[in-house]
């Protein structure tokens, strides 16, 4: 409660000071630009109307946009169709894929509760591809 009373008193004391600062402003009739309204003693604060584009700049911008559109179309035409892979190479992930490993002696080997799977050659005694 005491804090609210102190803040109220501070605000009431500060209001006359802010009103006195506003009294020194120029009358509103003679003001031509918004930067003169707030600070008449500082000319040119940089508040200017946006510059109009010249016809040369507009033509250059149109040419750039047209060139970008043509480049996108040409990129799509020159792109080769993706080759659908029928197998997974050695040491590449085979997790969730329904295609076999490219190497006939490799198998999809999974570790860490089937969270990490990759094509790997496994050497066993019964496997004809085993390393000897």
Curated annotation (Swiss-Prot):
Expressed primarily in the adrenal gland, subthalamic nucleus, and hypothalamus, with a lower level of expression occurring in testis, lung, and kidney. GO terms for biological process: adult feeding behavior; circadian rhythm; eating behavior; feeding behavior; hormone-mediated signaling pathway; long-day photoperiodism; maternal process involved in female pregnancy; neuropeptide signaling pathway. The presence of a 'disulfide through disulfide knot' structurally defines this protein as a knottin. It is found in: Secreted; Golgi apparatus lumen. This is Agouti-related protein. Residues 87-129 form the Agouti domain. One of its GO terms (cellular component) is neuronal cell body. The gene is AGRP. It comes from Homo sapiens (Human). Keywords: Disease variant, Disulfide bond, Golgi apparatus, Knottin, Obesity, Secreted, Signal. It is linked to Obesity: A condition characterized by an increase of body weight beyond the limitation of skeletal and physical requirements, as the result of excessive accumulation of body fat. Residues 21-82 form a propeptide. Residues 1-20 form the signal peptide. Disulfide bonds join 87-102, 94-108, 101-119, 105-129, 110-117.
């Amino acid at each position: 409660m005491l804090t609210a009373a102190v803040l109220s008193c501070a605000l009431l004391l500060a209001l006359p000071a802010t009103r006195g600062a506003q009294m020194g402003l120029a009358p509103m009739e003679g003001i031509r630009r918004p930067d003169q309204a707030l600070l008449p003693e500082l000319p040119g604060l940089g508040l200017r109307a946006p510059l109009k584009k010249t016809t040369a700049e507009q033509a250059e911008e149109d040419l750039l946009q047209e060139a970008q559109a043509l480049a996108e179309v040409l990129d799509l035409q020159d792109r080769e169709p993706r080759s659908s892979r029928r197998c997974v190479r050695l040491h590449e992930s085979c997790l969730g894929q329904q295609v076999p490993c490219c190497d006939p002696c490799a198998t999809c080997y999974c570790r860490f509760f089937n969270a990490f799977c990759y094509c790997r050659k496994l050497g066993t005694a019964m496997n004809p591809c085993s390393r000897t």
